[in-house]
């Protein structure tokens, strides 16, 4: 790993990386290279050196010592010396496996991502470069197909992606492993060898050493190009569907209780689009749906079915006549009654209650359940004493013949929401409910009134 003059005879690795960097990167900001010392990341290190030499851009190096192998500490020192030799800023993280719990691979991945993000923010770096190449793409796509993943995941690894406000780039994704090894050999560069890459106890090793070679022999040709083609086609299809549902994604309402989307007013949306949309929203909210639930939920939305729900862990999906909810927690209103009058600031569970005297204007509107979903409710009542509390199904509305439950049903208030928000009582009847936005108090323009505001504290 000494300082050498790179050769590029009949090899296009450097030129492909240069084209990639010019396509996606700004020359004014450095990159961060995740350097393990393996063949892929080492070749990328020297390609980025070539880019720096031509003034295309500069870069930093980040190495993570997982401590999985005895030689890892020695390798970290070698990489540190390599970076210093070429005057490349070097950053290192040593992971203490004894401090991690649960799935070690997942825990280490989160540690790496956190480490990379910190370096990028501290040094104003534009992206993290990863060493994945075409063979990694082939293995990823085949694995997802065999696992029965959703088709939207068949696009495999991305050349460019964002995660947790950090951009990740894969300049080698269109280059085969053989080309990378030839590049290293032609320049007399020796990479570290990770024994786990050949250990068939690991799925990746079995894919590389047994499954894919066996498929090649069985088909009588290499399947690599076919799988890369599938990834490309699925990427185009995914972008098409994303374009179709993007306007709906912009209509999502998020609040302290979860996520809401009204699909009742979009009769032209197809079932396959609904399925993709629900999966996309659910994955963004870390609420992963089984195939059966996804199919049933999508059909319920398409048919505008009432009151369907699914519970998974601490979250819950509710579908009601085309309205789609993901609830983040149980939020039924079970607080003791609260006396309200005059100007005051009080608390009703997680609701902050602010009351003050004001003057009524006809252009003032009371809140609806959608406002409540966002965590804010407001209304205006005649000056008097009231009680804030939970509604009961058979309670009567003040100056109205209907029960509260019939009133809400006639105005299509989703049943599960009715226990989320308090009502205002007076003389054992409900003086105001917040879910329909309808006023029944006959306040006159300019009349002095009691303004009541509820804000949900998260």
From Swiss-Prot:
<dbReference type="InterPro" id="IPR014729">
    <property type="entry name" value="Rossmann-like_a/b/a_fold"/>
</dbReference>
<dbReference type="InterPro" id="IPR012094">
    <property type="entry name" value="tRNA_Ile_lys_synt"/>
</dbReference>
<dbReference type="GO" id="GO:0005737">
    <property type="term" value="C:cytoplasm"/>
</dbReference>
<keyword id="KW-0436">Ligase</keyword>
<keyword id="KW-0547">Nucleotide-binding</keyword>
<dbReference type="GO" id="GO:0005524">
    <property type="term" value="F:ATP binding"/>
</dbReference>
<dbReference type="GO" id="GO:0006400">
    <property type="term" value="P:tRNA modification"/>
</dbReference>
<feature type="binding site">
    <location>
        <begin position="36"/>
        <end position="41"/>
    </location>
    <ligand>
        <name>ATP</name>
    </ligand>
</feature>
<dbReference type="InterPro" id="IPR011063">
    <property type="entry name" value="TilS/TtcA_N"/>
</dbReference>
<dbReference type="GO" id="GO:0032267">
    <property type="term" value="F:tRNA(Ile)-lysidine synthase activity"/>
</dbReference>
<keyword id="KW-0819">tRNA processing</keyword>
<comment type="function">
    <text>Ligates lysine onto the cytidine present at position 34 of the AUA codon-specific tRNA(Ile) that contains the anticodon CAU, in an ATP-dependent manner. Cytidine is converted to lysidine, thus changing the amino acid specificity of the tRNA from methionine to isoleucine.</text>
</comment>
<protein>
    <recommendedName>
        <fullName>tRNA(Ile)-lysidine synthase</fullName>
        <ecNumber>6.3.4.19</ecNumber>
    </recommendedName>
</protein>
<comment type="similarity">
    <text>Belongs to the tRNA(Ile)-lysidine synthase family.</text>
</comment>
<keyword id="KW-0963">Cytoplasm</keyword>
<dbReference type="InterPro" id="IPR012795">
    <property type="entry name" value="tRNA_Ile_lys_synt_N"/>
</dbReference>
<dbReference type="Pfam" id="PF01171">
    <property type="entry name" value="ATP_bind_3"/>
</dbReference>
<keyword id="KW-0067">ATP-binding</keyword>
